[in-house]
Amino acid sequence: LKACYTFFLFGCGSLALIVIYDTQNNSSRYFRIWVIYMSKFYPIHLDVTGKKCVIIGGGKVAYRKACGLKESGADVVVVSPEVCSEMVNEEGIAFIKKEYEECFLDGALLVIAATDNEAVNKKVTLDAEKRGIIVNVVDHPEHCSFIVPSTINRGDLCISVSTGGASPAVEKRIREELEGAFGKEYEEYLDLLTKMRSLA
């Protein structure tokens, strides 16, 4: 791993202290400190292939979530009276251009609430919980039954980074470090290992 930052994690109960030492500047020392809540979430990779995944909202955040689910093979349904221009031009996504209604969750594996309307997001959460559907409310981890981590993908290698929603800045910083440490060559390396394993 490239020697740019040194991370220290001190935990006690549900609280954690993260100290990051910046080693990029040789003449001075820079420290950054975050106090965060330890994640209550169980890390898991979910197979969404061919599964209905609903996104409530039509903005750029909703667009990014929709693209991520589509790339993973999900049947993506976006519910919003209006959608951003990027969403309009995206193929492979079904649109329901209406205000949110509970019936739009029929048959869904998961739902993501990505609107700027707190009342709508709350209703989506309650409806999903009532139906036993896992739900994510963007930027509100306290209302989520699952969260979406930052990921680095190198072929079959997938590295996930999450602070449980406590500090997106820390999450981004760590992800960027890992992106540098695990380059594109890891995709070829894992392909080779897979072929070698099949011959064993």
Where are these regions (language model features)?
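Glycine-rich, highly charged phosphate/nucleotide-binding loops
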Residues: 91-106
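An accessory alpha-helical subdomain
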Residues: 165-200
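Short, Lys/Arg-enriched N-terminal segments with co-localized hydrophobic residues
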Residues: 17-37
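Hydrophobic, well-ordered beta-alpha structural blocks that scaffold small-molecule cofactor pockets
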Residues: 35-82, 87-88
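ADP-ribose/adenylate-binding Rossmann-like module
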Residues: 110-114, 121-147
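Residue-level detector of alpha-helix initiation sites
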Residues: 59-61, 119, 165
